[in-house]
Amino acid sequence: MSMQDPISDMLTRVRNGQAANKVAVKMPSSKLKVAIAALLKAEGYIVDFAVEGEAKPELEVTLKYFQAKPVIEQLKRVSRPGLRVYKKKDQLPSVMGGLGIAIVSTSKGLMSDRAARKAGLGGEIICYVA
C-alpha cells in the first residue's frame, strides 16, 4: 500500500521519536521533506539532518532536547491532501503569539510565516511548529 501523505508521516515520526526520547529518526527522503528539515534546523527546532543512500535515499533527523524535554512541543499538519489550506500574505497565522512558526509553501519555496510576511507572499500552510 502506498503512503497517502508523506509529510504527515514525517511529522508523526518526529513526534513519536521525541516522545520516546530518541536521538534521531529515519524516514524516506524527498525534496519537500529535506526543505522542511532545513527550515526546522534554521529555526532551531532540530540539531541536524542528513540524507543517506543513493537508490532509496533516507532522511535522518537529529532531534533536539532542552533539559531533557523536547524542543518541539507541538507539531501539527494543517494543509493535507483531502483539505488544502491556502492563505494570503495578510492572513498568515501567528503560531502561539509569534513563539512558534507556520511552515508555508510559497512560489519562492518553503519558508516560515515571518519570512513569508516579510517577503509579501502567501501560500499553502504546511504545518505549525511550536
Swiss-Prot record:
Q: Which SUPFAM superfamilies match?
A: Ribosomal protein S8
The alphabetized UniProt keywords are: Ribonucleoprotein, Ribosomal protein, RNA-binding, rRNA-binding
User: Coiled coil located at which positions?
Assistant: none
The record's Gene3D superfamilies line, in alphabetical order, gives: 3.30.1370.30, 3.30.1490.10
What PROSITE patterns is this protein classified in? Answer: RIBOSOMAL_S8
From what superkingdom does this record's organism come? Bacteria
What the entry lists under InterPro entries is as follows: Ribosomal_uS8, Ribosomal_uS8_CS, Ribosomal_uS8_sf
Give GO BP annotations, semicolon-separated.
translation
| Keyword RNA-binding tagged | yes
- One function term, GO molecular function aspect: rRNA binding
Q: Record's Pfam families?
A: Ribosomal_S8
Gene Ontology terms: cellular component? ribonucleoprotein complex; ribosome
Assembly and partners are described as: Part of the 30S ribosomal subunit. Contacts proteins S5 and S12.
User: What does the sequence similarity comment in the record state about its family?
Assistant: Belongs to the universal ribosomal protein uS8 family.
* Role: One of the primary rRNA binding proteins, it binds directly to 16S rRNA central domain where it helps coordinate assembly of the platform of the 30S subunit.
| Record-linked PANTHER family | 40S RIBOSOMAL PROTEIN S15A (PTHR11758)
What is the protein's name according to its record?
Small ribosomal subunit protein uS8
Q: What is the lineage of its organism?
A: Bacteria, Pseudomonadati, Pseudomonadota, Gammaproteobacteria, Vibrionales
